[in-house]
Amino acid sequence: MKELLELCTDLKFRNAVSYLQSGNLVLESTLKAAELESTLEREIADRFGYADVSVMALTKAGLSAVIDGLPKHWREYDPSKLHFSFLKMAGAQAGSAASKDYLPDEYAVGERVVYVHCPNGYGRTKLNNSFVERLTGTQATTRNWNTTRHLLELVAA
């Protein structure tokens, strides 16, 4: 992630930090989210040759809203079984698959996220990132509860 942080410095983003080797960054910028996404996508392609990288930028308020939007009854679940599939496009429409068709796993669609609960583990669920992308018709990236919580802590620091 050192190279990614150097890129952020070169682009004049402030206070850039990465979380582990997850590809997640927390930074300060005057750019709007969509502009930040396109700038990073272009620069990553130019500098590192990764033309198919999709960047998803959320504000502190946006990340807080995602966590706060977790279905209320899910707050009783084991947090290690909760995942957040962040969506590239806000307002993506969910397809026709019913959450009950995948029990004991379940999902709920939010504004820019699909919440996934998989009591038998993410490695065993059919509600993986590919499923979410087919369901919503947009790119997604999935993070577990622990990573999402740590990102919010980094943003709040």
Give the predicted meaning of each segment.
Residues 1-157:
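Surface-exposed, charge/polar-rich loops and edge strands
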